[in-house]
Protein backbone atom coordinates (compact mmCIF):
# COMPACT_ATOMS: atom_id res chain seq x y z
CA UNK A 1 0.00 0.00 0.00
CA UNK A 2 1.16 3.55 -0.53
CA UNK A 3 -0.15 7.09 -0.53
CA UNK A 4 -2.82 7.67 -3.11
CA UNK A 5 -4.10 9.55 -6.11
CA UNK A 6 -1.71 12.51 -6.31
CA UNK A 7 1.18 10.04 -6.48
CA UNK A 8 -0.27 7.80 -9.17
CA UNK A 9 2.01 7.66 -12.24
CA UNK A 10 2.54 11.06 -13.79
CA UNK A 11 1.58 11.06 -17.48
CA UNK A 12 3.64 14.15 -18.31
CA UNK A 13 6.94 13.53 -16.53
CA UNK A 14 7.84 10.30 -18.32
CA UNK A 15 10.05 10.78 -21.40
CA UNK A 16 9.20 8.81 -24.55
CA UNK A 17 10.79 5.37 -24.81
CA UNK A 18 11.26 3.39 -28.01
CA UNK A 19 9.45 0.06 -28.15
CA UNK A 20 11.39 -2.84 -29.62
CA UNK A 21 9.93 -4.94 -32.41
CA UNK A 22 10.63 -8.51 -31.30
CA UNK A 23 8.92 -10.38 -34.14
CA UNK A 24 6.81 -9.64 -37.21
CA UNK A 25 5.07 -12.00 -39.60
CA UNK A 26 6.65 -12.31 -43.04
CA UNK A 27 4.83 -10.18 -45.63
CA UNK A 28 2.43 -8.76 -43.05
CA UNK A 29 -0.62 -7.26 -44.78
CA UNK A 30 -1.42 -3.80 -43.35
CA UNK A 31 -4.89 -3.86 -44.96
CA UNK A 32 -6.23 -6.33 -42.37
CA UNK A 33 -9.27 -4.76 -40.71
CA UNK A 34 -9.52 -6.76 -37.44
CA UNK A 35 -6.78 -6.82 -34.79
CA UNK A 36 -6.64 -8.77 -31.53
CA UNK A 37 -4.45 -7.18 -28.84
CA UNK A 38 -2.79 -9.12 -26.01
CA UNK A 39 -0.74 -7.51 -23.20
CA UNK A 40 1.72 -10.13 -21.88
CA UNK A 41 3.52 -10.39 -18.56
CA UNK A 42 5.26 -13.48 -17.13
CA UNK A 43 2.63 -16.06 -18.14
CA UNK A 44 4.18 -17.87 -21.13
CA UNK A 45 2.37 -21.16 -20.44
CA UNK A 46 -1.03 -19.50 -20.31
CA UNK A 47 -0.16 -17.31 -23.30
CA UNK A 48 0.42 -20.41 -25.40
CA UNK A 49 -3.13 -21.55 -24.61
CA UNK A 50 -4.47 -18.07 -25.45
CA UNK A 51 -2.75 -18.03 -28.83
CA UNK A 52 -3.84 -21.57 -29.64
CA UNK A 53 -7.45 -20.54 -29.02
CA UNK A 54 -7.02 -17.67 -31.48
CA UNK A 55 -5.46 -19.94 -34.08
CA UNK A 56 -8.53 -22.19 -33.84
CA UNK A 57 -11.16 -19.47 -34.36
CA UNK A 58 -14.04 -20.43 -36.65
CA UNK A 59 -14.25 -17.44 -38.96
CA UNK A 60 -13.58 -16.47 -42.55
CA UNK A 61 -12.52 -12.99 -41.45
CA UNK A 62 -8.88 -12.02 -41.69
CA UNK A 63 -7.38 -10.83 -38.43
CA UNK A 64 -3.97 -10.04 -37.00
CA UNK A 65 -2.64 -10.37 -33.46
CA UNK A 66 -0.55 -7.75 -31.65
CA UNK A 67 1.28 -9.04 -28.57
CA UNK A 68 3.06 -6.73 -26.13
CA UNK A 69 5.75 -8.10 -23.84
CA UNK A 70 5.82 -5.92 -20.71
CA UNK A 71 8.77 -7.55 -18.97
CA UNK A 72 11.79 -6.46 -20.97
CA UNK A 73 14.27 -8.15 -18.62
CA UNK A 74 12.81 -11.67 -18.85
CA UNK A 75 10.86 -11.48 -22.13
CA UNK A 76 9.31 -14.89 -21.47
CA UNK A 77 6.39 -14.16 -23.78
CA UNK A 78 8.52 -13.36 -26.83
CA UNK A 79 9.54 -16.96 -27.72
CA UNK A 80 5.93 -18.11 -27.44
CA UNK A 81 4.62 -15.27 -29.58
CA UNK A 82 7.43 -15.71 -32.10
CA UNK A 83 6.75 -19.43 -32.49
CA UNK A 84 3.12 -18.81 -33.47
CA UNK A 85 4.03 -16.03 -35.90
CA UNK A 86 6.86 -18.02 -37.46
CA UNK A 87 4.55 -21.00 -37.94
CA UNK A 88 2.04 -18.80 -39.74
CA UNK A 89 -0.82 -19.68 -37.40
CA UNK A 90 -1.94 -16.08 -37.74
CA UNK A 91 -0.31 -12.84 -38.90
CA UNK A 92 0.84 -10.26 -36.41
CA UNK A 93 3.63 -8.65 -34.44
CA UNK A 94 5.22 -8.87 -31.02
CA UNK A 95 6.67 -5.72 -29.47
CA UNK A 96 8.43 -5.07 -26.18
CA UNK A 97 7.19 -2.20 -24.02
CA UNK A 98 10.09 -1.46 -21.62
CA UNK A 99 8.03 0.76 -19.30
CA UNK A 100 6.29 -1.54 -16.88
CA UNK A 101 2.64 -1.37 -15.89
CA UNK A 102 -0.82 -2.50 -16.91
CA UNK A 103 -1.83 0.69 -18.74
CA UNK A 104 1.56 0.97 -20.43
CA UNK A 105 1.17 -2.50 -21.94
CA UNK A 106 -2.42 -1.98 -23.09
CA UNK A 107 -1.67 1.43 -24.60
CA UNK A 108 1.30 -0.07 -26.43
CA UNK A 109 -0.92 -2.80 -27.87
CA UNK A 110 -3.60 -0.44 -29.13
CA UNK A 111 -1.13 2.17 -30.40
CA UNK A 112 0.84 -0.47 -32.29
CA UNK A 113 -2.34 -1.92 -33.79
CA UNK A 114 -3.64 1.49 -34.85
CA UNK A 115 -0.34 2.43 -36.48
CA UNK A 116 0.51 -0.85 -38.21
CA UNK A 117 -3.01 -1.55 -39.48
CA UNK A 118 -4.37 1.78 -40.76
CA UNK A 119 -7.41 0.11 -42.35
CA UNK A 120 -8.41 -1.78 -39.20
CA UNK A 121 -11.84 -0.88 -37.85
CA UNK A 122 -12.23 -3.37 -34.98
CA UNK A 123 -9.75 -3.82 -32.14
CA UNK A 124 -10.37 -6.70 -29.76
CA UNK A 125 -8.56 -7.53 -26.56
CA UNK A 126 -7.95 -10.73 -24.64
CA UNK A 127 -5.63 -11.24 -21.68
CA UNK A 128 -2.68 -13.63 -21.67
CA UNK A 129 -4.35 -16.00 -19.20
CA UNK A 130 -7.61 -16.32 -21.14
CA UNK A 131 -8.94 -18.75 -23.74
CA UNK A 132 -11.35 -17.64 -26.46
CA UNK A 133 -14.25 -19.88 -27.44
CA UNK A 134 -14.18 -21.06 -31.06
CA UNK A 135 -16.71 -18.49 -32.30
CA UNK A 136 -15.59 -15.61 -30.09
CA UNK A 137 -14.15 -13.32 -32.74
CA UNK A 138 -16.97 -13.96 -35.22
CA UNK A 139 -19.64 -13.23 -32.61
CA UNK A 140 -17.96 -10.05 -31.38
CA UNK A 141 -17.38 -8.57 -34.84
CA UNK A 142 -20.83 -9.60 -36.09
CA UNK A 143 -22.45 -7.92 -33.09
CA UNK A 144 -20.50 -4.71 -33.70
CA UNK A 145 -21.55 -4.68 -37.35
CA UNK A 146 -25.20 -5.53 -36.65
CA UNK A 147 -25.74 -3.07 -33.80
CA UNK A 148 -23.39 -0.23 -34.72
CA UNK A 149 -22.21 -0.15 -31.12
CA UNK A 150 -18.98 1.69 -30.42
CA UNK A 151 -17.87 -0.92 -27.89
CA UNK A 152 -18.82 -4.58 -27.51
CA UNK A 153 -18.21 -6.70 -24.43
CA UNK A 154 -18.62 -10.34 -23.51
CA UNK A 155 -18.33 -12.58 -20.46
CA UNK A 156 -15.08 -13.80 -18.94
CA UNK A 157 -15.92 -17.01 -17.09
CA UNK A 158 -13.53 -18.35 -14.45
CA UNK A 159 -11.99 -21.80 -14.76
CA UNK A 160 -10.53 -22.79 -11.41
CA UNK A 161 -7.45 -24.97 -11.05
CA UNK A 162 -9.17 -26.41 -7.97
CA UNK A 163 -12.66 -27.57 -9.00
CA UNK A 164 -13.72 -27.47 -5.35
CA UNK A 165 -13.74 -23.68 -5.74
CA UNK A 166 -16.48 -23.71 -8.40
CA UNK A 167 -18.87 -22.04 -5.95
CA UNK A 168 -16.82 -18.85 -6.35
CA UNK A 169 -18.13 -18.40 -9.91
CA UNK A 170 -20.97 -16.31 -8.50
CA UNK A 171 -18.66 -14.14 -6.40
CA UNK A 172 -18.56 -10.51 -7.65
CA UNK A 173 -14.79 -10.78 -8.06
CA UNK A 174 -15.32 -13.40 -10.79
CA UNK A 175 -18.89 -13.08 -12.11
CA UNK A 176 -19.53 -11.18 -15.38
CA UNK A 177 -21.32 -7.85 -15.20
CA UNK A 178 -24.29 -9.03 -17.33
CA UNK A 179 -25.99 -12.33 -18.17
CA UNK A 180 -27.95 -11.53 -21.35
CA UNK A 181 -27.10 -10.15 -24.78
CA UNK A 182 -28.24 -6.67 -25.70
CA UNK A 183 -27.49 -2.97 -25.23
CA UNK A 184 -25.87 -2.13 -21.89
CA UNK A 185 -24.99 1.21 -20.29
CA UNK A 186 -21.27 0.45 -19.95
CA UNK A 187 -18.78 -2.40 -19.60
CA UNK A 188 -16.09 -2.47 -16.94
CA UNK A 189 -13.22 -4.68 -18.09
CA UNK A 190 -11.14 -5.02 -21.24
CA UNK A 191 -10.42 -8.75 -20.96
CA UNK A 192 -13.16 -9.44 -23.51
CA UNK A 193 -13.96 -6.38 -25.57
CA UNK A 194 -14.13 -4.93 -29.06
CA UNK A 195 -13.47 -1.23 -29.63
CA UNK A 196 -14.23 0.50 -32.92
CA UNK A 197 -11.49 2.71 -34.38
CA UNK A 198 -13.34 6.06 -34.02
CA UNK A 199 -13.46 5.55 -30.24
CA UNK A 200 -9.72 6.15 -29.96
CA UNK A 201 -9.94 9.33 -32.04
CA UNK A 202 -12.66 10.76 -29.78
CA UNK A 203 -10.72 10.28 -26.53
CA UNK A 204 -7.50 11.96 -25.45
CA UNK A 205 -4.18 10.11 -25.66
CA UNK A 206 -3.13 7.91 -24.07
CA UNK A 207 -6.30 5.82 -24.19
CA UNK A 208 -5.69 4.24 -20.78
CA UNK A 209 -4.88 6.85 -18.13
CA UNK A 210 -1.42 6.17 -16.69
CA UNK A 211 -2.60 7.23 -13.26
CA UNK A 212 -4.12 3.73 -13.11
CA UNK A 213 -0.94 2.05 -14.32
CA UNK A 214 -0.10 0.11 -11.16
CA UNK A 215 -3.46 0.19 -9.38
CA UNK A 216 -5.41 -1.23 -12.31
CA UNK A 217 -8.80 0.06 -13.40
CA UNK A 218 -7.57 1.88 -16.47
CA UNK A 219 -10.19 -0.09 -18.41
CA UNK A 220 -13.00 0.95 -16.04
CA UNK A 221 -11.91 4.57 -16.38
CA UNK A 222 -11.62 4.29 -20.17
CA UNK A 223 -15.10 2.83 -20.63
CA UNK A 224 -16.60 5.32 -18.16
CA UNK A 225 -15.14 8.19 -20.20
CA UNK A 226 -16.59 6.60 -23.33
CA UNK A 227 -20.01 6.52 -21.69
CA UNK A 228 -19.74 10.16 -20.64
CA UNK A 229 -18.87 10.99 -24.26
CA UNK A 230 -22.11 9.39 -25.44
CA UNK A 231 -20.71 6.19 -26.91
CA UNK A 232 -22.84 3.06 -27.10
CA UNK A 233 -22.18 -0.39 -25.63
CA UNK A 234 -23.47 -3.86 -26.49
CA UNK A 235 -23.08 -7.16 -24.64
CA UNK A 236 -22.72 -10.55 -26.39
CA UNK A 237 -23.41 -13.30 -23.88
CA UNK A 238 -22.42 -16.01 -26.36
CA UNK A 239 -18.94 -14.56 -27.05
CA UNK A 240 -17.38 -16.44 -24.18
CA UNK A 241 -13.84 -16.21 -22.92
CA UNK A 242 -12.60 -18.37 -20.05
CA UNK A 243 -10.02 -17.19 -17.55
CA UNK A 244 -7.61 -19.55 -15.83
CA UNK A 245 -7.80 -18.88 -12.08
CA UNK A 246 -4.89 -20.36 -10.11
CA UNK A 247 -5.46 -21.66 -6.61
CA UNK A 248 -3.67 -18.64 -5.13
CA UNK A 249 -6.46 -16.37 -6.40
CA UNK A 250 -9.14 -18.28 -4.54
CA UNK A 251 -7.69 -17.62 -1.10
CA UNK A 252 -9.65 -15.24 1.17
CA UNK A 253 -6.70 -12.83 1.36
CA UNK A 254 -6.49 -12.43 -2.44
CA UNK A 255 -10.25 -12.02 -2.77
CA UNK A 256 -10.27 -9.41 0.00
CA UNK A 257 -7.45 -7.49 -1.70
CA UNK A 258 -9.38 -7.68 -4.97
CA UNK A 259 -12.31 -6.02 -3.21
CA UNK A 260 -10.03 -3.31 -1.82
CA UNK A 261 -8.67 -2.67 -5.32
CA UNK A 262 -12.17 -2.44 -6.82
CA UNK A 263 -13.08 0.09 -4.15
CA UNK A 264 -9.97 2.16 -4.83
CA UNK A 265 -10.67 2.12 -8.57
CA UNK A 266 -14.28 3.22 -8.00
CA UNK A 267 -13.05 6.16 -5.94
CA UNK A 268 -10.45 7.31 -8.46
CA UNK A 269 -12.81 7.04 -11.45
CA UNK A 270 -15.38 9.19 -9.62
CA UNK A 271 -12.69 11.58 -8.39
CA UNK A 272 -11.65 12.33 -11.97
CA UNK A 273 -15.23 13.38 -12.71
CA UNK A 274 -15.39 15.60 -9.59
CA UNK A 275 -13.98 18.81 -11.06
CA UNK A 276 -14.24 21.09 -8.01
CA UNK A 277 -12.89 20.94 -4.49
CA UNK A 278 -16.42 20.88 -3.09
CA UNK A 279 -17.40 17.88 -5.22
CA UNK A 280 -14.25 16.05 -4.18
CA UNK A 281 -14.99 16.78 -0.54
CA UNK A 282 -18.51 15.40 -0.94
CA UNK A 283 -17.10 12.33 -2.68
CA UNK A 284 -14.76 11.70 0.25
CA UNK A 285 -17.69 11.93 2.67
CA UNK A 286 -19.68 9.54 0.48
CA UNK A 287 -16.87 6.98 0.45
CA UNK A 288 -16.47 7.15 4.22
CA UNK A 289 -20.24 6.77 4.68
CA UNK A 290 -20.18 3.57 2.63
CA UNK A 291 -18.33 1.75 5.42
CA UNK A 292 -21.28 1.43 7.83
CA UNK A 293 -23.67 0.80 4.91
CA UNK A 294 -21.48 -2.08 3.75
CA UNK A 295 -22.14 -3.88 7.03
CA UNK A 296 -25.85 -3.94 6.18
CA UNK A 297 -25.15 -5.33 2.70
CA UNK A 298 -22.80 -7.93 4.16
CA UNK A 299 -25.45 -9.06 6.63
CA UNK A 300 -28.00 -9.41 3.84
CA UNK A 301 -25.58 -11.53 1.80
CA UNK A 302 -24.92 -13.80 4.77
CA UNK A 303 -28.65 -14.49 4.98
CA UNK A 304 -29.19 -14.98 1.23
CA UNK A 305 -25.93 -16.56 0.04
CA UNK A 306 -24.72 -18.27 3.21
CA UNK A 307 -21.12 -17.62 2.16
CA UNK A 308 -18.72 -15.58 4.25
CA UNK A 309 -16.50 -14.74 1.25
CA UNK A 310 -19.50 -13.34 -0.62
CA UNK A 311 -20.53 -11.26 2.39
CA UNK A 312 -17.01 -9.92 2.81
CA UNK A 313 -16.99 -8.32 -0.66
CA UNK A 314 -19.10 -5.17 -0.04
CA UNK A 315 -17.08 -4.44 3.11
CA UNK A 316 -13.79 -4.83 1.22
CA UNK A 317 -14.98 -2.56 -1.61
CA UNK A 318 -16.18 0.10 0.84
CA UNK A 319 -12.92 -0.11 2.77
CA UNK A 320 -10.93 0.21 -0.46
CA UNK A 321 -12.84 3.34 -1.46
CA UNK A 322 -12.42 4.89 1.99
CA UNK A 323 -8.70 4.11 2.12
CA UNK A 324 -8.20 5.55 -1.37
CA UNK A 325 -10.01 8.72 -0.28
CA UNK A 326 -7.48 8.95 2.55
CA UNK A 327 -4.54 8.41 0.18
CA UNK A 328 -3.87 4.69 0.63
CA UNK A 329 -4.15 2.15 -2.19
CA UNK A 330 -2.81 -1.21 -3.41
CA UNK A 331 -0.48 -1.50 -6.41
CA UNK A 332 -1.03 -4.99 -7.79
CA UNK A 333 0.47 -4.22 -11.22
CA UNK A 334 3.95 -3.27 -9.99
CA UNK A 335 6.39 -5.95 -11.11
CA UNK A 336 7.52 -6.45 -7.51
CA UNK A 337 3.95 -7.42 -6.59
CA UNK A 338 3.56 -10.02 -9.34
CA UNK A 339 4.92 -13.53 -9.20
Question: What is each of the regions a protein language model found here?
Answer:
Residues 118-131:
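Short beta-strand-to-loop acidic/aromatic patch adjacent to the donor-nucleotide binding site
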Amino acid sequence: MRSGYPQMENTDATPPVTRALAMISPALDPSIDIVVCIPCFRRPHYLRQTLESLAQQRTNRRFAVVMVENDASRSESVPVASSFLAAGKFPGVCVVEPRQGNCRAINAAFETALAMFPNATSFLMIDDDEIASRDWLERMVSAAEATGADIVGGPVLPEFDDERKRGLRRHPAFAPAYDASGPVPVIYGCGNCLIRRPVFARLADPAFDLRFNFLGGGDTDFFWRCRLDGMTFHWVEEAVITETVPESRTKPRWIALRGLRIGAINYHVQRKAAQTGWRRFKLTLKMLAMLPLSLFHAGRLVLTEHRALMAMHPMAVAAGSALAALGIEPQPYKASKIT
